[in-house]
Design a protein with these regions (language model features):
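Amphipathic alpha-helical assembly/interaction segments
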Residues: 1-125
């Protein structure tokens, strides 16, 4: 019984470490994209996206330290959904009809793949 608990703890710790690393990689990809946002959204929408990514990283660090992870995982899943919606808004051409979207389709697609992978990791936990 004790061996099973130790193996489970080891496995869960690795999963959280991988989630944290994926969030870190996403931040490294996303931050340079945010500086190219139009001035009108650079400090609002881009700031919200940046804040959400940093909140996700903070939650992943908290997950490493907690024994009971369910509520923190649920909160992290909510942040993933918030980020998905913020990125969707950033790529929407109707946000500013007379301007190009804050994110081009390719950048949005790559970023969303990273977010979706994190979401799948959380869901599989």
């Amino acid at each position: 019984m004790e061996e099973i608990q130790q193996e489970e703890k080891k496995h869960n710790g690795n999963d959280i470490f991988h989630i944290k690393e994926k969030i870190y990689e996403m931040i490294l990809y996303g931050n340079p994209q945010l500086k190219d946002f139009p001035k009108a959204e650079r400090y609002v929408l881009a700031g919200d996206i940046r804040k959400t990514m940093y909140t996700m990283l903070e939650m992943a660090v908290r997950l490493e330290k907690k024994y009971h992870k369910k509520t923190t995982l649920q909160d992290l899943d909510i942040e993933v959904d918030v980020l998905r919606n913020l990125l969707r808004l950033a790529k929407d051409p109707n946000l500013y009809p007379n301007q190009k979207p804050c994110l081009d389709f390719h950048t949005w697609e790559v970023w969303m793949r990273k977010v979706d992978e994190i979401g799948r990791m959380i869901g599989g936990y």
